[in-house]
């Protein structure tokens, strides 16, 4: 099969929030075309790669991406046409050079990532391999344990809960398919419980419920009820993962906090660490993402020293999938796990580099979607390719989330007895 890029095109499509995003098409000289669509985040770290928006208030409230589309067509395409499709790193590095900025603000990370993902997909097609094996090699066979978002708060919902995501993690399941069943059943039983108490069963951006609860702890209490109502044991069969997205309630993004949604009041780093320790003792928490704000490096270091032997302390906004910040975290022991988001850094190659750095340090890593997703299932293959064993891609509702789960079910079926699954 031919492996030379003959055309690159792009268009504006909508993500799961109804906002524009970029879809890129890469065509090989035998006529094969592969496409990829770029996700978008709501709670974003200040050091993330920049998605380019038009700022034209007359279109999509200023959120159009025609500039990014134009950059794909008129700047990136001429540079990559004629390149060998399997030279992923070379193509990604070429786009980084074309952009010339640290945060990809010139061409836009949404333009660059769209091309990077489409190139990877076309490379897999050209190599006659599934995407997960093309990116991860023939040994890629570990299906990630899903962390299903079942209660939303913070920036992802309009309610009285500060913590952005309360996730159910099927740590005791024997396979991905069974694990997905465990947490889907828990999701549906949670809906029944909420309904029986007159609480809202509307969902947030990632498909989790967004009820008005009296406290953050009330959210975990009701999830435990749902786990038990499903016939499972909290901690043994299903554990918790949390994402505080603490920068969203930190006025200075460093050591001060205001639990404004729940009315929990003002806190400092020491208060937040004490709260985390209390919750870890009380609830079956195995992973906690961004428990502190993105510039509270000292707080992260203290928290990791206190609880890092019990749970994964996951840096998201802290590291933004960037090896520069991950290296600092490893040096300072500011966490023990990294959230990997393709659009935080802007290329497939740099995302793989971030994973490689985690592996070399003995750190865990968690592959993640964004709150503004599309029907593209690239993330599912990428998670298997990276062999990290952990994935967050939303709830058991909203088809842009379900698409990733269904792709993982397909991969598990393809691998058969060779598939691995463990926390």
Swiss-Prot record:
Mg(2+) binds at residues 243, 289, 316. Its main location: cytoplasm. Pfam families: Enolase_C (PF00113), Enolase_N (PF03952). SUPFAM superfamilies: Enolase C-terminal domain-like (SSF51604), Enolase N-terminal domain-like (SSF54826). One of its GO terms (biological process) is glycolytic process. CDD domains: enolase. PROSITE patterns: ENOLASE. (2R)-2-phosphoglycerate binds at residues 164, 341, 370-371, 392. Catalyzes the reversible conversion of 2-phosphoglycerate (2-PG) into phosphoenolpyruvate (PEP). It is essential for the degradation of carbohydrates via glycolysis. This is Enolase. It comes from Desulfotalea psychrophila (strain LSv54 / DSM 12343). The gene is eno.
């Amino acid at each position: 099969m031919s492996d030379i890029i003959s055309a690159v095109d792009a268009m504006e499509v909508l993500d799961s929030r109804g906002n524009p995003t970029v879809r890129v098409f890469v065509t090989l000289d035998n006529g094969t075309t592969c496409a990829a669509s770029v996700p978008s985040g709501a709670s974003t770290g200040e050091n993330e790669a920049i998605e380019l928006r038009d700022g034209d208030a007359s279109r999509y409230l200023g959120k159009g991406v025609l500039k990014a589309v134009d950059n794909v067509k008129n700047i990136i395409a001429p540079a990559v046409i004629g390149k060998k499709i399997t030279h992923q790193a070379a193509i990604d590095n070429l786009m980084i050079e074309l952009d010339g900025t640290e945060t990809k603000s010139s061409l836009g990370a949404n333009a660059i990532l769209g091309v990077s993902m489409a190139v990877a997909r076309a490379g897999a097609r050209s190599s006659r391999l599934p995407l997960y094996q093309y990116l991860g090699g023939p040994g890629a066979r570990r299906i990630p344990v899903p962390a299903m978002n079942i209660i939303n708060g913070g920036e992802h919902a309009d309610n009285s809960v500060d913590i952005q995501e309360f996730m159910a993690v099927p740590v005791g399941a024997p396979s991905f398919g069974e694990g997905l069943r465990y947490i889907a059943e828990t999701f549906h039983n949670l809906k029944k419980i909420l309904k029986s108490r007159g609480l809202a069963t509307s969902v947030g951006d990632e498909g989790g419920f967004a009820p008005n609860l009296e406290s953050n702890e009330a959210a975990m209490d009701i999830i435990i009820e749902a786990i038990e109502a499903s016939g499972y044991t909290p901690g043994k069969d299903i554990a918790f993962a949390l994402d505080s997205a603490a920068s969203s309630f930190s006025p200075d993004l460093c050591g001060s906090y205001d639990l404004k949604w729940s009315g929990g009041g003002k806190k400092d780093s020491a208060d937040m660490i004490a709260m985390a320790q209390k919750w870890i003792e009380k609830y079956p928490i195995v992973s906690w993402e961004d428990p502190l704000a993105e510039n509270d490096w000292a707080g992260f270091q203290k928290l990791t020293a206190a609880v890092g032997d019990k749970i994964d302390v996951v840096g998201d906004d802290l590291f933004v999938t960037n090896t520069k910040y991950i290296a600092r975290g490893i040096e300072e022991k500011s966490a023990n796990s990294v959230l990997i988001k393709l659009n935080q850094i802007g290329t497939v190659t740099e995302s793989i580099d971030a994973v490689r750095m985690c592996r070399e340090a003995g750190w865990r890593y968690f592959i993640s979607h964004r709150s503004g997703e599309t029907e593209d299932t690239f993330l599912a293959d990428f998670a298997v390719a990276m062999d990290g064993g952990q994935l967050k891609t939303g709830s058991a509702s909203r088809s842009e989330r379900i698409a990733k789960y269904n792709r993982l079910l397909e991969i598990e079926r393809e691998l058969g007895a060779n598939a691995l699954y463990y926390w």
